[in-house]
């Protein structure tokens, strides 16, 4: 079996940013998260990085994955996305580190074709390479192939794919592997003499936070907190207003207000104008997570007329 065929068999195809499982999930609602997206894209498109790693963190439902999916899509369109991996706790192949390096190497071979022969040679030299440690795999399948082509004329160091995007690291099923992946990615960036960079998102779990607090990872990373750095209320308001507008345009209500409508009104101390509605629906949490949004939208669908 050829080296690239062996590699393909080790790839977690459903973890790619443009796989059906990932790309079908919500991205940032148009006009929301503008400041965060602008910040990440401006950082990613720079020609040099003071800190080559950004850790995007926040609690469940704060929008980390939607932001990562959107950024991956935008960078892919600009030809800057090198590789991505979207972990998911219940997704086969996406919930462990077993296929992580192979999946990254596969994408590198596709977006920088000059690396493919070197990756294939590494697999041919050691057909058991995928049973080695993650670091040994990274050296053979990521670092060495990139180093081998640095002096080739086709490798433009200013206009080339150079951003890794990793999402949901906390959903990897082995906490030790979570920290191992962080260490490996940091070492990969240190071994490459030209600028490459990483945006990684996770919940601020104890082990992950600890890894960012010390050592080389602390020195080469910056942090972007979704629960402190950015006020999400305007984004929530825009999302709700747009969704309410869609419902109003597409599905006129029957008799107003109707019993269920009265039930919704009863949640508010006064008629549900935008400000009071917003306050009543999100005052239980600093962040209005996606679960709450789903519940709200499902309830609103029951208010629509039939037929």
Task: Tell where the protein language model's regions lie, with residue ranges.
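Conserved NB-ARC/NACHT P-loop NTPase core of NLR-like innate immune receptors
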Residues: 1-307
């Amino acid at each position: 079996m050829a080296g690239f065929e062996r590699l393909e068999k080790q790839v977690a195809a459903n973890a790619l940013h443009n796989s059906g499982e990932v790309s079908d999930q919500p991205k940032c609602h148009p006009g929301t998260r503008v400041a965060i997206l602008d910040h990440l894209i401006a950082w990613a498109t720079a020609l040099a990085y003071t800190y080559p790693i950004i850790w995007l963190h926040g609690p469940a439902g704060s929008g980390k994955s939607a932001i990562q999916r959107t950024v991956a899509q935008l960078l892919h369109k600009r030809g800057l996305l090198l590789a991505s991996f979207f972990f998911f706790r219940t997704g086969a192949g996406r919930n462990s580190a077993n296929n992580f390096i192979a999946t990254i190497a596969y994408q590198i071979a596709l977006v920088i074709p000059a690396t493919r022969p070197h990756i294939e040679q590494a697999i041919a030299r050691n057909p058991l390479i995928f049973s080695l440690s993650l670091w040994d795999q990274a050296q053979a399948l990521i670092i060495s192939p990139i180093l081998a082509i640095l002096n080739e004329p086709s490798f433009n160091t200013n206009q080339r794919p150079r951003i890794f995007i990793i999402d949901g690291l906390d959903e990897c099923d082995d906490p030790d592997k979570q920290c191992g992946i962080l260490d490996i990615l940091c070492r990969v960036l240190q071994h490459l003499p030209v600028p490459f960079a990483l945006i990684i998102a996770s919940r601020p779990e104890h082990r992950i936070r600890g890894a960012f607090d010390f050592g080389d990872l602390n020195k080469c990373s910056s942090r972007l907190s979704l629960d402190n750095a950015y006020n999400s209320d305007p984004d929530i308001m825009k999302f709700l207003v747009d969704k309410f507008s869609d419902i109003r345009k597409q599905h006129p209500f029957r008799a107003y207000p109707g019993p269920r409508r009265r039930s919704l009104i009863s949640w508010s101390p006064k008629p549900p104008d935008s400000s009071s509605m917003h306050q009543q629906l999100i005052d239980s949490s600093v962040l209005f997570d996606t679960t709450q949004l789903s519940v709200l939208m499902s309830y609103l669908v029951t208010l629509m007329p039939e037929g």
